[in-house]
A protein has these predicted regions:
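Active-site neighborhoods and metal-handling regions in enzymes and metal-associated proteins
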Residues: 1-248
């Protein structure tokens, strides 16, 4: 079932999502060569709790960390660890909070030091495709319009769209209906209505679209071990168009 939110509920969601954006901003101050991804997880958990919220990923279906941190060829759901970031890495940070009974969710892929130009181009295209998808998140469109916009933008530039993982509705639960794929056909899928809140999150690979799941049961990486990028915003569909909730 798709739950439509009232204006008041969307304002409460904005608080949880704004904190996610603030957390990403705090992490950006620390992402550099020489820091471990586990240290970033600790920084995020303390920041979220200090701001009166709960890290919503921690314990979700048994996930053991506050952040999903995925480095280079890892696509999503990577575990923070003792891995020390080095110059040239790219790191996807997926962060969720719960505040006032509502969830926030956002992801951003950061460059660590000097990154190869072709990898930076992948990150730019993935981020731009997110906004192409958001442009289609308007009342009267369908979920397929979002996926088509993301897929078309990325594939025209020679990148591939991960199929196994998709965006989702968001509200009192981290994952609600509907699923929001990053691929699709215009005019298909669930109808977008005022009050829907969805997380749009392109996961785009430099090489093949194919992925594999690591032995930890969570981490997803590209099969060909080429880099991947991941950007995400939580968005409310309003009578005035899409409203990005995770933006500062």
């Amino acid at each position: 079932m798709i739950f439509l939110k009232t204006d008041e509920e969307i304002e409460l969601m904005r608080e949880a999502n704004r904190l996610v954006g603030m957390t990403q901003g705090e992490l950006a101050k620390h992402i550099r060569p020489g820091i471990t991804t586990l240290s970033l997880n600790k920084i995020a958990e303390e920041f979220i709790r200090d701001n009166g919220a709960i890290p919503s990923f921690l314990g979700y279906n048994g996930f053991p960390y506050t952040l999903c941190i995925s480095v280079n060829e890892q696509v999503v759901h990577g575990f923070p660890s003792d891995y020390i970031l080095k110059d040239g890495d790219v790191i996807s940070v997926d962060c969720g909070t719960e505040k006032n009974g509502f969830c926030g969710d956002s992801a951003y892929t950061f460059c660590v030091g000097e990154v190869a130009e072709d990898v930076k181009a992948l990150l730019r295209a993935t981020k731009e495709s997110l906004y192409k998808g958001i442009e289609k998140a308007i009342e009267g469109n369908r979920v397929g319009d979002i996926g088509d916009a993301v897929q078309t933008y990325c594939e025209k530039r020679g990148y591939s769209v991960v199929r196994e993982l998709v965006g989702h509705g968001i509200g009192r639960k981290m994952h609600e209906a509907p699923e929001v794929p990053n691929y699709g056909k215009r005019g298909t899928g669930p109808l977008l209505k005022k009050g829907m809140c969805i997380a749009i999150e392109p996961m785009i690979n430099m090489g093949s679209k194919n992925v594999v799941f690591e032995s930890d049961g969570w981490t997803v990486r590209t099969r060909d071990r080429k880099p991947s990028a991941h950007f995400e915003h939580s968005v409310a569909i309003t009578s005035n168009g899409p409203t990005i909730l995770t933006i500062l």
